[in-house]
Amino acid sequence: VPVAPPRRWWLPLLWLLMIVSLAAGLGLRQPQPPDEPRFVLAARAMVDSGQWLLPHRGRELYAEKPPVFMWLQAAAHQAVGSWQASFLLPSLLAALLTLWLVADLARRLGSPRHARYALAALFCTLQFALMAKRAQIDMVLVALTTASLWGLLRHLAERPNLPALWLAGIAAGVGTVTKGVGFLPLLLVLPWLGWRVYLRRRGQPVPGPHPASLLCLLPAFLLGLAVWLAPLGWALLHTPDDALRAYAHELLFKQTGTRYANAWHHRQPPWYYLQVMLTLWLPGSLLLP
């Protein structure tokens, strides 16, 4: 009769399975179009030229995405020394960080049993595994937004924790300059404030930190934005270059503002995300009522 491993080994064995599964194939394939080759070429140009502030594709500035993800790829290459082995590392490490944050939050707000279930559920989600094995910005964005939610919930739902709150703001700021939607986790404060108002009107005790503590999210968020916007602003002020101004206008206004207000591509019908949830969130979507 097979003997089950002791309960204390379940979590280490699960982590070993996840690391081996997500890292499988690392260094065995080339970047695949459409996005991976562009990011790798921009990161390679940073390493070759020593100019990391602005990503280039050939001689032209690459203004479609901020450089944060390409910085991570270039840093991974500096550590590993091989583009084929390093271009997927940021996504892999971001996936592992996301898994740890989810498990830790489930343990803090629930129990070790909840942590195991949350960890296994996220790891088994089809879209999560796909993004973890692609050199795209999305997995890094997920890690940053999860870090922001982790910090917010530790402060709001566990106990007052200003360092965690600062981390939430900084992660949201870095997420925003990584891909524009990184600020979304901060909107969690709106239903939390509404819940406090509801309890107060019913004459019930209002647990949690004082709302004034949330004011530190603003400087923390600006600090996260400054990771890239500060050196970009300095370059704009001290370098009278029309190409640099055109790059900043293209990225900050067209690629960000215009995409929000009037997207010119990736148009989808209203039910698009329902379709994504039902298919790419398998097998967890089978549990939907």
List PLM regions with ranges:
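Specific aromatic-rich, kink-prone transmembrane helix
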Residues: 99-101, 130, 141-158, 171
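Short acidic/glycine- and proline-prone juxtamembrane loop motifs at membrane-interface regions
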Residues: 88, 133-141, 181
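Extracytosolic helix-loop segments that constitute the early lumenal/periplasmic catalytic or substrate-binding loops
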Residues: 20-23, 38-61, 68, 75
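Transmembrane-helix signature of polytopic, membrane-embedded enzymes
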Residues: 11-12, 102-124
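Transmembrane-helix motifs of polytopic, lipid-linked glycan transferases
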Residues: 89-110, 147
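Loop-to-helix entry region of an early transmembrane alpha helix in multi-pass inner-membrane enzymes
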Residues: 67, 71, 80-97, 135
